[in-house]
């Protein structure tokens, strides 16, 4: 059997797996130090009681011969699709356009597989590493990095003379923590329509947006229905990281160049490749949507971001993002240190594990990412260490 040639283009280790190995090695060699890990975007707050109760009740029903059930609908429970349409999208996305999945990352893989190999895929730089790896694994003909630089407020720079088939766009952004406003998002949508580009819009952090003027969905721009697909997740807002539940929106108006409707092929694709997300997870998701606007976990993580920002600014770092996302994009000021050494510096001097920006792409060079998804006691301890230890010096 021949090896899949696309694996040749991957790095040996996935970024976050490699970081955890380095943290484990440091702990082994320095048992006297307690490492605070702010490198991974993993949730730390427990499930809301009503969500946990819905989950447990659903599992209990599966244990009874009178209420147990087998496969659920391929496209998701009607109750969950309808509640997302009414409560999350306020009716501007129809329930039939919402497809429930087992997570945003796997949906990204499904979508790029669905559209087939030999596509030219554009990705923000810096960006979540899975975009690049999945584009490679699914046989992208060309992958174009769109620089998102500090001097341009991390807004992507689009090429003038290169055709793009698919644009992966994330807002609120991972890793920069910044969010596109309506004018910026509208400009990207119109650019996509003009250049016949499909946007895969990752809105996994949209529930962190607190400013009502900022778009939580690309479909707040009406024309996006002709050029975009949206991916979202229950992982961060509801603490479903280990439960796995997400969704994808395919607008009914979206067509291929030949006029055929994408949603028809997507339904056929899912019927063949997917038997539906976990029923207990979906029923817990219905309960979670009822409390989402008042969810304490989101406020908790926002407060973590505020604490980290104040400590980092007081220590002499430049800080971006974090207001509408659980990530802070941090730049050491007056420093002359290589990207390779940034991770080791924070681990050695502060005993804090962060993510070096270069791991998210070339344009991440010189930055590091802090996650605010940790426990409050760890965030407070990290803030204390940042203020006591020496800042980077040139």
UniProtKB/Swiss-Prot annotation:
Gene Ontology molecular functions: L,L-diaminopimelate aminotransferase activity; pyridoxal phosphate binding
Enzyme Commission identifier(s): 2.6.1.83
Binding site for substrate: 14, 41, 105, 128, 174, 275, 369
PROSITE patterns: AA_TRANSFER_CLASS_1
Record-listed N6-(pyridoxal phosphate)lysine modification sites: 236
Database matches in Gene3D superfamilies: Aspartate Aminotransferase, domain 1, Type I PLP-dependent aspartate aminotransferase-like (Major domain)
Residues holding pyridoxal 5'-phosphate: 71, 104-105, 128, 174, 205, 233-235, 244, 275
Entry cofactors: pyridoxal 5'-phosphate
Domain of life: Bacteria
Quaternary structure note: Homodimer.
Function noted in UniProt: Involved in the synthesis of meso-diaminopimelate (m-DAP or DL-DAP), required for both lysine and peptidoglycan biosynthesis. Catalyzes the direct conversion of tetrahydrodipicolinate to LL-diaminopimelate. Is also able to use meso-diaminopimelate, cystathionine, lysine or ornithine as substrates.
Family (UniProt): Belongs to the class-I pyridoxal-phosphate-dependent aminotransferase family. LL-diaminopimelate aminotransferase subfamily.
Annotated protein name in UniProt: LL-diaminopimelate aminotransferase
Species name: Chlamydia trachomatis serovar D (strain ATCC VR-885 / DSM 19411 / UW-3/Cx)
């Amino acid at each position: 059997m021949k090896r899949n040639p696309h694996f040749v283009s991957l790095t040996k280790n996935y970024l976050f797996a490699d970081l955890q190995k380095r943290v484990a090695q440091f702990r082994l060699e320095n048992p006297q130090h307690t490492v605070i890990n702010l490198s991974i975007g993993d949730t730390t707050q427990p499930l809301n009681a009503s969500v946990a109760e819905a989950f447990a009740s659903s599992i209990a029903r599966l244990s009874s011969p009178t209420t147990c059930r087998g496969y659920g609908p391929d496209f998701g429970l009607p109750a969950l699709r309808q509640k997302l349409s009414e409560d999350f999208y306020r009716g501007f996305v129809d329930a039939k356009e919402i497809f429930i999945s087992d997570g945003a990352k796997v949906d990204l893989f499904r979508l790029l597989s669905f559209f087939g190999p030999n596509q030219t895929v554009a990705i923000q730089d810096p960006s979540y590493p899975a975009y690049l790896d999945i584009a490679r694994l699914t046989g992208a003909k060309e992958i174009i990095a769109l620089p998102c630089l500090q001097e341009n407020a991390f807004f992507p720079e689009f090429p003038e003379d290169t055709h793009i088939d698919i644009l992966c766009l994330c807002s609120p952004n991972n890793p920069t923590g910044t969010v596109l406003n309506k004018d910026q998002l509208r400009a990207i949508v119109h650019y996509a329509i003009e250049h016949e580009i499909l946007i895969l819009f990752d809105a996994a952090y949209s529930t962190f947006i607190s400013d009502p003027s900022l778009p939580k969905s690309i479909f707040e721009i009406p024309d996006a229905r002709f050029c975009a697909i949206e991916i979202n997740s229950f992982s961060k807002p509801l603490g479903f990281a280990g439960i796995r539940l997400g969704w994808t929106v395919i607008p009914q108006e979206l067509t291929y160049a030949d006029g055929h409707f994408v949603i028809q092929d997507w339904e056929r694709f899912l019927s063949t490749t997917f038997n539906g997300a976990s029923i207990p997870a979906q029923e817990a998701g219905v309960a979670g949507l009822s409390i989402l606007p008042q969810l304490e976990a989101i406020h908790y993580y926002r407060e973590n971001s505020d604490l980290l920002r104040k400590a980092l600014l007081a220590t002499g770092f430049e800080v971006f993002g974090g207001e509408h996302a659980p990530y802070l994009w941090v730049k050491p000021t007056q420093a002359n240190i290589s990207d390779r050494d940034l991770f080791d510096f924070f681990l050695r001097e502060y005993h804090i594990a962060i993510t070096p920006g270069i791991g998210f792409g070339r344009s991440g060079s010189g930055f590091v990412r802090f996650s605010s998804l940790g426990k409050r006691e760890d965030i407070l301890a990290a803030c204390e260490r940042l203020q006591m230890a020496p800042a980077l010096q040139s």
